[in-house]
Each structure stands twice: as structure tokens, then as C-alpha cells.
Amino acid sequence: VLFRSAMSPVIREQHDEYPMITDPKGRMIVGQFGSYVPEMLKMKNFDLEPGDVILQSDPFMCGGAISHINDWIILVPVFFQGGLVGFTSMFGHMMDVGGPVPGSMPTAATSIFGEGLRIPPIKLYEGGVLNQAALDLIMTNTRTPEMNYSDLMAILAGCRAGEKRIIELCERFGADTYADACDALLERTERAMRSLIV
């Protein structure tokens, strides 16, 4: 979904993005960049409801899952029959997020404050309603608003595709079976890693 929808070459051609699916505790079930969800939710206590979408780009508020503010993370809580069954998430590298130089990666920066716009975890959508003021503020602070907007919506579409598949699994097998399968997958992965290390 993301590669077919993204506009910038950073995502479309370089594939500088990573997806993730977690259980309700934020433990990564599928993914590549490590789960930042427990760390972020601990720092930012959101009341999550269906239709919410969280956006952030702050490396200090995601347990180091991203390394710089060009990486925008979308987090979508997945609900089934009123209960939280997990999260889908994806980050993608944005072409420009403001700051003193195009591309927002200044070699002379001595702190994160010299890089550009840092986004703390915010609700981009709340109950399915877009936070237009937040989106306007973010897009006003980039040199590439059209690309950033397109890529952001493509990332969200990718998360929504994951959300849809999780709900389909819960409808087919039940939420309890889905949760048990997630636990079994985590336990199997732990056993495999222990056997490699020991």
C-alpha cells in the first residue's frame, strides 16, 4: 500500500520505512524496528478509542525506535467489539521537516533543536475526526508539504490495511484466539532466540 501511494523517492524508491503490528501491550508481533509503543504510552497517557491515529517524530519519546525527526511514526489502535486487540504502526522518512537546511539534516546542528520540527505524540485523528489545526501547523513547517502530506496519508493507509486484516482475523477466529496466537508467536520467537544465543 505504502509503496504504491507514497510520493517521495525516499519512501517509494529507497524504501526508508518500517511497518509493525503489536499486541495490546505494545509487544511487537510483526515488524523490523522494535516496539516503541509501551515507552510512548508510558510517557503520553492517551485515552484511546476507535478512529484515533497518533502521529509523532520525537526520538526521545519512542524508546529510540527512530533516530531523527525526519522519521514520522503513525500509530493506529485496533479495536474489535469494543476491546483493544493491538496496534498497527509504520514510520517513513520525510523529505523535509523544516530547520535551517533543505532535507532537515544539518551537519552543523549541535542538538535536536537545530534540526527542524519535532512532533510529540499527538492525536492526528480523534474518533475518526482529523485534527486539521495540527496538520496545518506541521505542513506549514516543511519545504515539501505536498510530498509530506501524500507520504503521511500513504503511511496511514498502510496502517489501516493492517488494522483491517487484524479485524478480519478476529472476526474469523475470535479475539481470544487471536490473542493466544500472538502470545504463542512471541513465546516461539523467544525460544528460538534463546537457542541461538545459548
Go through each PLM region and give its residues:
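Acidic side chains
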Residues: 16, 23, 52, 71, ...
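Short, solvent-exposed loop/edge-beta patches enriched in aromatic
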Residues: 24, 80-83
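N-terminal leader/propeptide and maturation segments of large enzyme subunits in energy/redox metabolism
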Residues: 1, 115-194
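A short, hydrophobic, proline-anchored segment that marks a local hinge/packing element in signaling
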Residues: 71-81, 89
